[in-house]
Amino acid sequence: MKVLPKRQILKRRGFTFLLARLISNWGYKNLTKAHVEFEEDLLDLKKRGSVLLYTGFHRSLWETTGMLSALNLNKLPIPIVGMGDNLIKGKLFVTLAKNTSIFLVKRGKTRREIVESAKELRSNMYSFMAYGRDVLLFPEGTRTGIPRTGEYGGFFPTSFDALLEFEKEKNSIDQNMKGIKILDSYIVPFNCDYSMIREASELVGFNSEKPRTLKVWDSLKMLKNIKDVFITFGKPVKVSEHLEKSRKEIAVMIREHCLDLVKILPVNVVAFALTESLNNGKSDMASIYKNIESVISRLNDFRDRFRGFKDFEPETMFITVSKSIPEFRKPSADKLPIYKLYADYIGHYMK
C-alpha cells in the first residue's frame, strides 16, 4: 500500500481567492473578446470522474489568469497553476500566490538545482493527481521560445512522468487518507492565439539587445484591451492508454497536439507578409498586399484553422490589423522583430 506524504494541498477559501477570481473574470469579460472552442465535452468528462492536466504553449502572462476564467465561466473547476518562481518575489506575493492556487516551480540555475526542481515538480504533480486536483502547466517553461529561436520550445517531460507513475500505481495508493480521489487522468492540450500580444515589445527586446522576462506584477501596467483571443481545448488524452510510452514520447506527442491547435489570425498573415517583404527590401504597399495574397494561398491546406477573417482582401486585412497594433501602421525594417514574432507563431504551417 503506497502512503502519500502529507502535503499542503492548496485551498481556495477566503477573501484572497474570491477577489482574484472576481478580478480575473472581470478582465476576461471586459478587456478581451474571447472565443472558446472545446473539441470534447470536458464538463461531461469531469462528471464521469477524471483529473485533468491542461498543457499548452506559453505566449503571454495573460494565459495564467485568462485560461482559468475561460474554464471557470464554462462551469469547469479552476485548476491549480504552475508558475516559475522567478516571476514572483517577496514573502507577501508568494503568500498571495499560494492563496490563489498557484504553485511555484523552482527555476534552477545549476545542474543540481535543476534536478532538485524536477524532483519537486514531479512529487507535487503526483500528489495533485492523487487528490483529484486539476493542474494547468506550460511545459515549455518560458514565453521566450518564439522570440529567441523563432520556434515553439520543446516540452519538458517531468510532469508527464508523474502522470505515468500515478496511473501505474494509483490502485496501490492508500485511499483511507483524507482527500484522496483515485480518478482516471487525462492530458488536455490547449492553445491560446492572440490578435495582440500585450507584452510583445518586451518579449522581443524592442529597443534593447535581448528579450527580458517580465515579472507577473509588471502585467498590471499592461492592463489594456487585447481584443480577440482564440482559446482551443483539444481532445483529452487518456494517460492509461499510453503507459507503454516513455515520458519523452508523451511530451513529444502532446506538443504535436498543441501545434495542431494553433489558429491562423489576420495579424499572423500580415506579419508573415511584412517580414518576407522587408527582408527582400520591399516596403511599398503594392508588394506587401501581393505578399499577403501569397501567404493566404500557401496556407490553403490549413483553412480550417483560420479565425477572425472578415475579409480576405489584402488592403482591408492590413488596415484592420494596423488599427489594433501601432507598429503595423507604417511598416519599416526597424520593427521587424515585432512582425517576426507574430509571423513565427504560424511558422510551422509555412514549412
Regions found by a protein language model. Give the residues of each.
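Membrane-interfacial terminal anchoring regions of lipid-handling membrane enzymes
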Residues: 1-351
